[in-house]
Amino acid sequence: MQKYLEKANVLIEALPYIRKFNSKIILIKYGGSAMENEELKHCVMQDIALLKLVGLKPIIVHGGGKDISAMCEKLGVKSEFKNGLRVSDKATIEVASMVLNHINKNLVHSLQNLGVKAIGLCGKDGALLECVKKDENLAFVGTIQKVNSKILEELLEKDFLPIIAPIGMDENFNTYNINADDAACAIAKALRAEKLAFLTDTAGLYEDFNDKNSLISKISLEQAKILAPKIEGGMHVKLKSCIDACENGVKKVHILDGRVKHSLLLEFFTDEGIGTLVG
């Protein structure tokens, strides 16, 4: 009997959060181990399906860097990185577009199998993500200048769950590779999302990454600004994205461990959560 009561308590604990976030836009940046491990992938899809089916409005922006690198190697296309960004010449862009489209359609299929009306897009569709060249040395890597959010608003209104590949275009219709974190942040800001969640390969934000007891469960925007200069590596960039989002209309940003099964539900629908909440 006790185990049944525990299950009931889990549902009851979730109830106020389901009510609070009903009809709210939740932007999820999906990448890392949560995309590469099939069991974790299924858990993420279940989480997102549940978010949708209980009344939230999730949107997914996905990466695909490792798959792009693997396909480039298979096809003999040279992969080069500068400051953590892939140098994207014409050949690389073609490979990236192909791989991201394949990932996108698989995600659509997975969610449709869970009863969700999902639709796949890339940033070129309807000029969703308008870009300019980020740096001449990076070739066709784009910085987003404009998000045509009306497209997404109309899809949400029609009960679709948009799944977006981070490929954009410029005014001359050139194709650009976009960092998926940047795309997720830009879209969340344009829609003034309730939440932006980054699925990562770390437990969250650490005050000192070498001290695993320094995990920060919650940090205000002002505290995040003070901490940011002290953080190094990829998490410094991630925290800057969190700050940017919170300063531009996104209410809360979450840094979650995508290696933990059902991390989205644990963060959004429980009192304690499991990651770092910024804002």
Curated annotation (Swiss-Prot):
<keyword id="KW-0963">Cytoplasm</keyword>
<keyword id="KW-0028">Amino-acid biosynthesis</keyword>
<keyword id="KW-0067">ATP-binding</keyword>
<comment type="pathway">
    <text>Amino-acid biosynthesis; L-arginine biosynthesis; N(2)-acetyl-L-ornithine from L-glutamate: step 2/4.</text>
</comment>
<dbReference type="InterPro" id="IPR001048">
    <property type="entry name" value="Asp/Glu/Uridylate_kinase"/>
</dbReference>
<comment type="function">
    <text>Catalyzes the ATP-dependent phosphorylation of N-acetyl-L-glutamate.</text>
</comment>
<dbReference type="InterPro" id="IPR037528">
    <property type="entry name" value="ArgB"/>
</dbReference>
<keyword id="KW-0418">Kinase</keyword>
<keyword id="KW-0808">Transferase</keyword>
<dbReference type="Pfam" id="PF00696">
    <property type="entry name" value="AA_kinase"/>
</dbReference>
<keyword id="KW-0547">Nucleotide-binding</keyword>
<dbReference type="GO" id="GO:0006526">
    <property type="term" value="P:L-arginine biosynthetic process"/>
</dbReference>
<keyword id="KW-0055">Arginine biosynthesis</keyword>
<feature type="binding site">
    <location>
        <begin position="64"/>
        <end position="65"/>
    </location>
    <ligand>
        <name>substrate</name>
    </ligand>
</feature>
<feature type="binding site">
    <location>
        <position position="86"/>
    </location>
    <ligand>
        <name>substrate</name>
    </ligand>
</feature>
<dbReference type="InterPro" id="IPR036393">
    <property type="entry name" value="AceGlu_kinase-like_sf"/>
</dbReference>
<dbReference type="GO" id="GO:0003991">
    <property type="term" value="F:acetylglutamate kinase activity"/>
</dbReference>
<feature type="site" description="Transition state stabilizer">
    <location>
        <position position="29"/>
    </location>
</feature>
<dbReference type="GO" id="GO:0005737">
    <property type="term" value="C:cytoplasm"/>
</dbReference>
<dbReference type="GO" id="GO:0005524">
    <property type="term" value="F:ATP binding"/>
</dbReference>
<feature type="binding site">
    <location>
        <position position="177"/>
    </location>
    <ligand>
        <name>substrate</name>
    </ligand>
</feature>
<dbReference type="InterPro" id="IPR004662">
    <property type="entry name" value="AcgluKinase_fam"/>
</dbReference>
<dbReference type="InterPro" id="IPR001057">
    <property type="entry name" value="Glu/AcGlu_kinase"/>
</dbReference>
<feature type="site" description="Transition state stabilizer">
    <location>
        <position position="238"/>
    </location>
</feature>
<comment type="similarity">
    <text>Belongs to the acetylglutamate kinase family. ArgB subfamily.</text>
</comment>
<protein>
    <recommendedName>
        <fullName>Acetylglutamate kinase</fullName>
        <ecNumber>2.7.2.8</ecNumber>
    </recommendedName>
</protein>
<dbReference type="GO" id="GO:0042450">
    <property type="term" value="P:arginine biosynthetic process via ornithine"/>
</dbReference>
<dbReference type="InterPro" id="IPR041727">
    <property type="entry name" value="NAGK-C"/>
</dbReference>
